[in-house]
A protein has these predicted regions:
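A short hydrophobic beta-strand element
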Residues: 112-124
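A solvent-exposed, acidic/Ser-Thr-rich amphipathic alpha-helical stretch
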Residues: 65-106
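Short, well-ordered alpha-helical segments enriched in acidic and aromatic residues
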Residues: 34, 47-72
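Ser/Thr/Pro/Gly-rich low-complexity linker/stalk segments immediately outside membranes or between
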Residues: 23-39
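Hydrophobic membrane-insertion alpha-helices, especially the h-region
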Residues: 5-21
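Short beta-strand edge/turn micro-motifs at domain boundaries
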Residues: 2-5, 24, 115-117, 131-162
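Short, cysteine-centered beta-strand-loop-beta hairpins and adjacent loop/turn segments enriched
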Residues: 93-97, 123-135
Length: 162
């Protein structure tokens, strides 16, 4: 291998490593990792009372105090982290038959890099009964960064074409 080829190889490897490092450590990647963490928490299951309270508290860390969840179709908006946590603790035993996977995540941050918007597809798969059933929904999220963590401040179900 000639010296020029070796130098070119080192430059290419360095550029790829720099790109990968920048991508992994970017705020956009941090938002994506945080959302995948939320999905992993949702997919965990527990059945005892203390475990349900602990899980709902952990799920609450992914939302701002004043989060608004708009499910559309005339449903009343869900307001506040405390409400989300209460609902999560009561629904957990019934949601254990489902898994959540987030795909097609697109993150756009505001110039201040402390807020942004996310569009993604949430795929809910019902396990058991012989055949899995999948329900996919497009979601639009507003996210904010506080105390070093990205949290959801608004979640809206995007209506599909009719």
């Amino acid at each position: 291998m000639s010296r020029a080829t070796a130098l070119l190889l080192v430059i290419v490897i360095g550029a790829v490593a720099a790109f990968a490092w920048t991508r992994w450590t970017s705020d956009e990647a941090a938002v994506e990792r945080r959302l995948h963490g939320l999905a992993a928490e949702v997919n965990e299951s527990t059945i005892d009372g203390a475990g349900l309270r602990a899980r709902s508290a952990q799920l609450g860390t992914y939302f701002t105090d004043d989060v608004v969840i708009d499910l559309g179709k005339g449903a009343a908006a869900i307001r506040g982290r405390a409400t989300v946590m209460d609902m999560a603790s009561r629904l957990q035993p019934r949601t254990s038959a489902f898994t959540l996977q987030l795909t097609d995540i697109g993150v756009v941050l505001a110039p201040d890099r402390l807020s942004g918007s996310v569009v993604l597809t949430a795929e809910f798969t019902r396990r058991g009964g012989g055949e899995n059933a999948i329900d996919a929904r497009e979601l639009s999220l507003a996210v904010t960064k506080a105390d070093g963590a990205w949290r959801i401040s608004r979640l809206t179900v995007v209506e599909a074409f009719k």
